[in-house]
Amino acid sequence: MTELTLSDLEQIVATRAGAAPEDSWTAKLVAAGQPKAAKKLGEEAVETVIAAVSGDRKNLIDESADLLYHLMVVLNIAAVPLQDVMSELARRTSQSGLQEKANRQNP
């Protein structure tokens, strides 16, 4: 099986975003704008939570894939590169989660 990275997914979304909306779900979602894309991301997040709580492993995998895809679409529309998100994660993981949270609450 070929391994797909989040960077690969980011590139796929960017490519498909440039297609005609009648030919691509991604292009249609991008053309609809950030409110529509963000709403869809929220729906997928809720579906992922429900799958996790219900203990449905297969559905959790499926919904997680949908969630990651829709996050990439939202980031694409906002012109936020995945690398910016990964850099923030790297910064946060350089310290304990509790310390990182305390730093955010008491800047």
UniProtKB/Swiss-Prot annotation:
CC per GO annotation: cytoplasm
GO molecular function: ATP binding; phosphoribosyl-ATP diphosphatase activity
Keyword DNA-binding: no
CDD domains in alphabetical order: NTP-PPase_HisIE_like (cd11534)
Transmembrane region(s): none
Entry EC no(s): 3.6.1.31
Domain of life from the UniProt record: Bacteria
Pathway(s) this gene product operates in, as recorded in its UniProt entry: Amino-acid biosynthesis; L-histidine biosynthesis; L-histidine from 5-phospho-alpha-D-ribose 1-diphosphate: step 2/9
GO annotation terms (biological process): L-histidine biosynthetic process
Reactions the enzyme catalyzes: 1-(5-phospho-beta-D-ribosyl)-ATP + H2O = 1-(5-phospho-beta-D-ribosyl)-5'-AMP + diphosphate + H(+)
Pfam family, one: PRA-PH
Location(s) in or outside the cell: Cytoplasm
Keyword annotations of the record: Amino-acid biosynthesis, ATP-binding, Cytoplasm, Histidine biosynthesis, Hydrolase, Nucleotide-binding
The keyword Hydrolase belongs to this UniProt entry's keyword annotation: yes
HAMAP family, per the entry: HisE
Family under the similarity heading: Belongs to the PRA-PH family.
Name of this protein: Phosphoribosyl-ATP pyrophosphatase
Organism encoding this protein: Sinorhizobium fredii (strain NBRC 101917 / NGR234)
Lineage start: Bacteria, Pseudomonadati, Pseudomonadota, Alphaproteobacteria, Hyphomicrobiales
